[in-house]
């Protein structure tokens, strides 16, 4: 897959494709699981399409594919923030990360420009997954998974 290819070329860690709805939750896993059941039990799968490839100076968003605006996902994000009691000034930017890295901008740009993505690119999100992100990427662990109805 593309993430594996870019990770190999950039000598950076590989990871599973995902859309991050919320991150860095401070509560216990038990509490988060209960809130996930409340929040996601009646949510239908979400169809998400993507617009273009971009890059940022953030490690976890080094090279990304931007998602087209999606009112259902936006509403789910707002609802999840309320369920999980998250107060933030950060703007929700739905995207699919393709590369985690601290590469120099020039090298990142070369990798980004080498990406050929068929159009249109879309995915259907069929589940919500809780991942403990303590430690390095190789220490991340999936702890809970709930299918969308």
What does each of the following model-derived ranges do?
Residues 52-60, 97, 128-138:
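Short proline/glycine- and acidic-rich turn/helix-capping motifs at secondary-structure junctions
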